[in-house]
């Protein structure tokens, strides 16, 4: 067998919702459930994939580069680059990502240093199902309510909160000093790519030194090469029946239901993807 189905680990989050409980999986999580993890922190040569059910605002936050993580947390610590594929979005949904181009880097730097609210200084990006966004380390961001997100990231949990919308909890401290070191005030919003649901085939959506994101849109019944440690997640077209429902697909002989994921353990992967479905692959660099 060249793939294994991953049992997700459900994680409670103050901003989570109700859509991930049906995935089952390992661990004990009490509602609201915000994340389903396919992989673990610290995995070697393997990205971490998560599903995020965003019912409330996430904190305004930033992640460090590998170099800064090692400086602040010790040798061997890594930063956190991530990317998002929007699987479902409520009407009018948006997110915050990078400095608003109408705001100068000096204005953002001053707000960070003074402890002012930086959320109004960030780019407000409307999103819909199928949008793909890259989030380099150093880029301020916040996911907003009404989103179901497939996230791929480096296997690190280094997150520096700049603000948390007035929520006060010892479990959710702010990290002003670290954030000041981490934020790249020059970073503006990255261009939004989109999954083309009308054209069957394969397309690499994002590639960088941390991971690659590839989408294979059905109908598709060919094999492809992927490195050991790649993770595949089946989703359904939002125009069909939504990301969380729809027909099953097959990868490396395994049947995957929508939102199930499999770990690829060998190079050549046979796939059977029905019309209206796609496989999202997160691969090591």
Show which residues each predicted segment covers.
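C-terminal amphipathic alpha-helical segment
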Residues: 160-226, 245-248
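Short, structured beta-strand/loop micro-motifs enriched in basic residues and often containing a Trp
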Residues: 110-121, 247
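His/acidic/aromatic-lined binding-pocket segments of jelly-roll/cupin-type domains
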Residues: 49-50, 58, 76-77, 82-85, ...
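Ligand-binding loop in jelly-roll beta-barrel domains
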Residues: 54-57, 65-67, 79, 89-92, ...
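Short beta-strand segments in beta-sandwich/barrel cores
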Residues: 222-223, 238-251, 261, 269
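Short acidic-glycine-tyrosine-enriched beta hairpin
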Residues: 122-134, 250-270
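Basic (Lys/Arg-enriched) interaction patch that binds polyanionic ligands
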Residues: 117, 123-153
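Transition-metal
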Residues: 1-104, 156, 164-189, 213
């Amino acid at each position: 067998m060249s793939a294994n189905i991953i049992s997700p680990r459900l994680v409670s989050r103050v901003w989570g919702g109700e859509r991930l409980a049906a995935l089952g999986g390992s661990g004990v999580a009490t509602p609201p459930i915000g994340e389903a993890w396919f992989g673990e922190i610290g995995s070697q040569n393997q990205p971490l994939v998560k599903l995020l059910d965003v019912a409330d605002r996430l904190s305004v936050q930033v992640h460090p580069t590998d170099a800064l993580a090692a400086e602040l947390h010790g040798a061997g610590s890594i930063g956190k680059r991530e990317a998002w594929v929007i699987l479902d979005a409520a009407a009018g949904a948006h997110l915050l990502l990078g400095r608003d181009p109408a705001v100068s880097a000096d204005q953002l730097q001053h707000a960070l240093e003074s402890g002012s609210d930086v959320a109004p200084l960030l780019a407000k990006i409307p999103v819909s199902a199928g949008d793909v966004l890259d989030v380099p380390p150093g880029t301020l961001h916040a996911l907003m309510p009404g989103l179901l997100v497939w996230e791929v990231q480096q296997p690190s949990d280094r997150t520096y909160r700049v603000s948390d919308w007035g929520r006060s909890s010892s479990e959710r401290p702010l990290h002003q000093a670290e954030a000041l070191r981490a934020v790249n005030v020059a970073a503006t919003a990255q261009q939004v790519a989109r999954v083309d649901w009308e054209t069957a085939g394969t397309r690499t959506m994002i590639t960088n030194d941390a991971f690659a994101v590839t989408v294979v849109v059905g109908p598709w019944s060919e094999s492809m090469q992927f490195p050991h440690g790649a993770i595949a997640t089946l989703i359904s077209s939002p125009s069909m029946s939504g990301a969380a429902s729809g027909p099953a697909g097959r990868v490396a002989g395994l049947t995957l239901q929508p939102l199930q994921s499999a770990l690829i353990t060998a190079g050549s992967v046979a796939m059977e993807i029905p019309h209206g479905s796609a496989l999202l692959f997160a691969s090591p660099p």
